[in-house]
Amino acid sequence: MNQGEYAYFGSSDNQRIQRNAEAIWELIRNDPRFCCHGRAVSLAKGFEENIQLQASLALLQGVGICDSVPSWHIENRRSALEKLGLRVEQMEIFRGGNHTITSARSVVSARNLPEDLELIYIDEDTSKSVLQGIDAFTQYHGASLPMESFLLKPGRRSVCITALDGHGNVVGTSAAGAHFHRNHARCDEAFWGMLATREDRRGQGIALLLGALCMLAMNERHGFDKFFTAVKKGNTPSERLCAKLGLKPNDTSAVIAIDPDFFQ
């Protein structure tokens, strides 16, 4: 358990979800049916037989996420979860193979961070004030961080980077982390994203560069060469950024079951 050593991030509701997720993860982390990169415990794959399991996750955690639900199963799954009293949302999954590393290298070789910005890779020496600044920034931009233990605890396979201006204010972020069990078929694929850029600095390619640098760090430090992310349907800027780094929609979605009572 956390025991105050590591922080939870996001809104008060998100922190409650992360606290619940950490406790659940201690119980089931050796079961490859489940996965987690530090924000919530998920089911690794969606099929008819695990709908009730997803509902149970939602009731225990506040949300129950099922990754990689094929398009033909989404409506049946949504209907079944709604009949259990849960609210349901979905996001499109974008995936990229090892060509993403080639794309990331091309981006990094062609771009530089604006001279007034400082690039920081979050580690155990990062000050609490910087972490708190990143937390507030990502909350404001709807891109919540993984819990601190998944970012900084020894042995965790993750990367979080930020760009700061001359006043120490956060301008952009990106993060990625191991998601699947080591025995899962997709164990070499990391969750990537959590991208955000300050409004007055958009259009300068900062998010693209940070996203590429994050991928390369995950590859160099932890050996990942495949990545996936979840994008809300119609989020054209995110879709375009994904395309530049070699991630494409693959006809699956993340289905999110939400316990409405948790947020009251």
Language-model features and meaning:
Residues 30-40, 180-192, 202, 225:
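A conserved beta-turn-beta hairpin within the catalytic core of GNAT-like acetyltransferases
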Residues 7-10, 73-88, 208, 233-251:
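Conserved active-site alpha-helix within GNAT-family acetyltransferase domains
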Residues 38-49, 193-203, 231-232:
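A short, internal acetyl-CoA/4′-phosphopantetheine-binding micro-motif in the GNAT/acyltransferase core
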Residues 2-8, 105-146:
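Short amphipathic alpha-helix that is part of the acyltransferase structural core
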Residues 16, 39-118:
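Acyl-donor-binding surface of acyltransferase catalytic domains
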Residues 49-57, 194-197, 203-218, 239-244:
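Conserved acetyl-CoA-binding loop-helix of GNAT-fold acetyltransferases
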Residues 141-197:
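A conserved beta-strand-loop-helix scaffold within acyl/acetyltransferase catalytic domains
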Residues 87-98, 230, 246-262:
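Conserved catalytic-core motifs of GNAT/GCN5-like acyltransferases
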